[in-house]
UniProtKB/Swiss-Prot annotation:
Subcellular location(s) of the protein: Membrane
Name of protein: Seripauperin-20
Gene: PAU20
Organism of this sequence: Saccharomyces cerevisiae (strain ATCC 204508 / S288c)
Regions that span the bilayer: 7-25
PANTHER family reported in the protein's UniProt record: CELL WALL PROTEIN CWP1-RELATED, SERIPAUPERIN
GO cellular component: fungal-type cell wall; fungal-type vacuole; membrane
Keywords tagged on the record: Membrane, Transmembrane, Transmembrane helix
InterPro entries: SRP1_TIP1, Yeast_SRP1/TIP1_CWP
Topology of the protein relative to the lipid bilayer: Single-pass membrane protein
Length: 120
């Protein structure tokens, strides 16, 4: 006879192994925070490239929160709340390496977090 506790333990193990998924609008703040996290990490990894882009496009500005997050190596996600979805999209898609570097990294990060997006 199987004990009820061993069945419960088995169900808990299966549930822990299955990743939960969530479908969110592309403008949802949780999606924006994942996108901004990837963006900040990319800026840190390719800072010279972003400086050159900024020099060539001085009208392309960044919110002060993004600049602070780039140079604050602690938990920066709380700094990035409140940036509008339109501004997030403009910043991320406005660089020439969006399609080749940022978009795949964002897709991977969203998938890792079990987040799938739908168009607004």
């Amino acid at each position: 006879m199987v004990k009820l506790t061993s069945i419960a333990a088995g169900v808990a193990a299966i549930a822990a192994g299955a990743s939960a998924t969530t479908t969110l609008a592309q403008s949802d703040e949780r999606v924006n925070l994942v996108e901004l996290g990837v963006y900040v990490s990319d800026i840190r990894a390719h800072l010279a490239q972003y400086y050159m882009f900024q020099a060539a496009h001085p009208t392309e500005t960044y919110p002060v929160e993004v600049a602070e997050a780039v140079f604050n190596y602690g938990d920066f996600t709380t700094m990035l709340t409140g940036i509008s979805p339109d501004q997030v999209t403009r910043m991320i898609t406005g660089v020439p390496w969006y399609s080749t570097r940022l978009k795949p990294a964002i897709s991977k990060a969203l998938s890792k977090d079990g987040i799938y997006t739908i168009a607004n």
